[in-house]
UniProtKB/Swiss-Prot annotation:
Post-translational modifications reported in the UniProt record: May be phosphorylated by FER.
Gene3D superfamilies per UniProt: Leucine-rich Repeat Variant
Disulphide bonds in the chain: none
Chain positions carrying an annotated carbohydrate: 14
Residue positions where Phosphoserine is found in the record: 99, 125, 182, 665, 730
ARM repeat start and end residues: 132-171, 172-215, 216-255, 258-297, 298-341, 342-381, 383-420, 423-464, 470-510, 512-551, 574-613, 615-661
UniProt-listed Pfam families: Arm
Lipid metabolism in keyword set: no
Gene: Jup
Span list, region Interaction with DSC1: 574-661
Any one Gene Ontology cellular component term annotated for this protein: nucleus
Record's protein name: Junction plakoglobin
Native source species: Rattus norvegicus (Rat)
Length: 745
């Protein structure tokens, strides 16, 4: 059949979305034929008839374009040469000869002669393929200048026909390599694609670039020819096959061509890609979302562009509505990248991202589950007030039973944040055996602070300020968690973990039944040791006039406050009170009354208030000269501090002479109790005032992302689940850790 007749036949178009897969071609190395344009005859390979194949290849150019007599003679000689080589090397390979072999075969049977001839036939076939490959390359190379000229023709009909021919050539490996080696032809294809308004021409030219993009040489040729801006322009095409060719070609460029990401960004590729999230073809969406991930990773400007174009909403919608695993995985990768962007995080959460991601935590795809877990963890610090997370919380509690380090890191971190300042979530986790699961996670974690620290923080949240807090406090003891928790106070544990553990111990001490186990675990000597060490370190900086530095994001003043506060609660028990007194702590507590930090003054006055209930301790407090600072604290702006100071003064004045007692009484009345009879009564009876108490002292924890390339630092919030306001001297942040993640390929 002649070439021009073939070209003029209607092009058979099939639904490309039914045929293409997520692999855009370069991964498998398959010489993918363009699924949307198929034509029989032109450049089709006929393995059984070498002569017919070669003749078709020859006539493609003798009739497709006007040629000189010399060209015709050249191609005829080329055809004759190939035919002579075939007949010389494989005399049985012609159409007539091969038909004889078939004619002798009995239907359904293979003769011994045919079996013996199989190796010979295979060799002949290989030689024929080799000859045909050479023919492809020679003919394509010969035709390139003329095809380039035709692509630049002013007649759109000529351009369309030339594009069809080049498209067919791009489907065969040998001719495709010849095309890649011609910068002029690739540039002509790019220009044609960019300037055409004809849909068939657009389809053919994008198909050509798609086929070339399966090879690194082709990617480089497209890039150098300015193909990226042209391909980005094609993302606005109404033809789905054109969209597919454009997005898969861009995908291959982003994956393997250096400089492609910047070129796509400069061509406003993100602005064109984000609206494509509204398409409804899962496989097309999988490639599109992977392009977004490649562009957004490590580039803050790209993340903001995605946000400005409604990307978070589109991505969450995909996670909510689709079940195609590759699409869910690629989409979760984009969300994971965006989830470390402070601007994108609230947008994802407000779009229902937490609930949409939670749907897939029970998926059979480990990589999807892991991406969802990391993304949930990253988002959880801005989702503490989100509703409808009951199922997510239950699944996270169940995930604590697995041994995978990444799963445990994500589950504990997310639970820690979602139980912060959320009484409903605390109650739900406690009622679903969350305390027991967290303790077991701590026991299995060993020295992995990325698991232990958020688990301790979550326990600290569960043991205070919600209806089931007392149940949680008892559950820690009943599940043998107290010894393991007290051991976490030992150095060289990281200071953030130590700080969180101190807060948890204070909460556990609120339950009287926990006092004996805490004492048996030697918690008081460890707290006192930490207190002395932290205070000495803080004092050195005060004496030197330098600002208190952070150690792993924790200031020593925070440790001083935490230890003193925990000892205050423990001192409510008579046995603990005696042990604290015997450790010679009163001089240090009196010293803390002079602190410039209001919170430290309060907890120091509070622990002295408890110790002063015993006469021996009260005398020791007086002997240390505590009266003067306590008198000053009567005028404190903090009512709790003033009340504790008044109670201590009242207690140590009991054995003083009448004049001293009268002076103290007048001072107390004038400064504190003039308008508050209840406070006066409390001071007289030594009943501690129900002053809210800070138990949340944790800083941000270390960002990690399962086995993925280092992403942006995770910005976790300062946990504020305490009973009194955040420390005014701490911003709750620690320097970012070195990234230790790698993107899943």
């Amino acid at each position: 059949m002649e070439v021009m007749n073939l070209i003029e036949q209607p092009i058979k178009v099939t639904e490309w979305q039914q045929t293409y897969t997520y692999d855009s071609g370069i991964h498998s190395g398959v010489n993918t034929c363009v699924p949307s344009v198929s034509s029989k005859g032109l450049l089709d390979e006929d393995d059984t008839c070498g002569r017919q194949y070669t003749l078709k290849k020859t006539t493609t150019y003798t009739q497709g374009v006007p040629q000189s007599q010399g060209d015709l003679e050249y191609q005829m000689s080329t055809t004759a040469r190939a035919k002579r080589v075939r007949e010389a090397m494989c005399p049985g390979v012609s159409g007539e000869d091969s038909s004889l072999l078939l004619a002798t075969q009995v239907e359904g049977q293979t003769t011994n002669l045919q079996r013996l001839a199989e190796p010979s036939q295979l060799l002949k076939s290989a030689i024929v393929h080799l000859i045909n490959y050479q023919d492809d390359a020679e003919l394509a190379t010969r035709a390139l200048p003329e095809l380039t000229k035709l692509l630049n023709d002013e007649d759109p009909v000529v351009v369309t026909k030339a594009a069809m021919i080049v498209n067919q050539l791009s489907k065969k490996e040998a001719s495709r390599r010849a095309l890649m080696g011609s910068p002029q032809l690739v540039a002509a294809v790019v220009r044609t694609m960019q300037n055409t308004s004809d849909l068939d021409t657009a389809r053919c030219t994008t198909s050509i670039l798609h086929n070339l993009s399966h090879h690194r040489e082709g990617l480089l040729a497209i890039f150098k020819s300015g193909g990226i801006p042209a391909l980005v322009r094609m993302l606005s095409s109404p033809v789905e096959s054109v969209l597919f060719y454009a997005i898969t070609t861009l995908h291959n460029l982003l994956l393997y061509q250096e400089g492609a990401k910047m070129a796509v960004r400069l061509a406003d590729g993100l602005q064109k890609m984000v609206p494509l999230l509204n398409k409804n073809n899962p496989k097309f969406l999988a490639i599109t979302t992977d392009c977004l991930q490649l562009l957004a990773y490590g580039n803050q400007e790209s993340k903001l562009i995605i946000l400005a174009n409604g990307g978070p909403q589109g991505l969450v919608q995909i996670m909510r509505n689709y079940s195609y695993e590759k699409l869910l995985w690629t989409t979760s990768r984009v969300l994971k990248v965006l989830s470390v962007c402070p601007s994108n995080k609230p947008a994802i959460v407000e779009a229902g991202g937490m609930q949409a991601l939670g749907k897939h935590l029970t998926s059979n795809s480990p990589r999807l589950v892991q991406n969802c877990l990391w993304t949930l963890r990253n988002l959880s610090d801005v989702a503490t007030k989100q509703e409808g997370l009951e199922n997510v919380l239950k699944i996270l509690v169940n995930q604590l039973s697995v041994d995978d380090v990444n799963v445990l890191t994500c589950a504990t971190g997310t639970l820690s944040n979602l139980t912060c300042n959320n009484s409903k979530n605390k109650t739900l986790v406690t009622q679903n055996s969350g305390v027991e699961a967290l303790i077991h996670a701590i026991l299995r974690a060993g020295d992995k602070d990325d698991i232990t620290e958020p688990a301790v923080c979550a326990l600290r949240h569960l043991t205070s300020r919600h209806p089931e807090a007392e149940m949680a406090q008892n559950s820690v003891r009943l599940n043998y968690g107290i010894p393991a928790i007290v051991k976490l106070l030992n150095q060289p544990n990281q200071w953030p973990l130590v700080k969180a553990t101190i807060g948890l111990i204070r909460n556990l001490a609120l339950c009287p039944a926990n006092h004996a186990p805490l004492q048996e675990a030697a918690v008081i000597p460890r707290l006192v040791q930490l207190l002395v060490k932290a205070h000495q370190d803080a004092q050195r900086h005060v004496a030197a006039g330098t600002q208190q530095p952070y150690t792993d994001g924790v200031r020593m003043e925070e440790i001083v406050e935490g230890c003193t506060g925990a000892l205050h609660i423990l001192a409510r028990d008579p046995m603990n009170r005696m042990e604290i007194f015997r450790l010679n702590t009163i001089p240090l507590f009196v010293q803390l009354l002079y602190s410039s930090v209001e919170n430290i003054q309060r907890v120091a006055a509070g622990v002295l208030c408890e110790l002063a209930q015993d006469k021996e301790a009260a005398d020791a407090i007086d002997a240390e000269g505590a009266s003067a600072p306590l008198m000053e604290l009567l005028h404190s702006r903090n009512e709790g501090t003033a009340t504790y100071a008044a109670a201590v003064l009242f207690r140590i004045s009991e054995d003083k002479n009448p004049d001293y007692r009268k002076r103290v009484s007048v001072e107390l009345t004038n400064s504190l109790f003039k308008h508050d009879p209840a406070a006066w009564e409390a001071a007289q009876s030594m009943i501690p005032i129900n002053e809210p108490y800070a138990d949340d002292m944790d800083a941000t924890y270390r960002p990690m992302y399962s086995s993925d390339v280092p992403l942006d630092p995770l910005d976790m919030h300062m946990d504020m689940d305490g009973d009194y306001p955040m420390d005014t001297y701490s911003d709750g942040l620690r320097p970012p850790y070195p990234a230790a993640d790698h993107m899943l390929a």
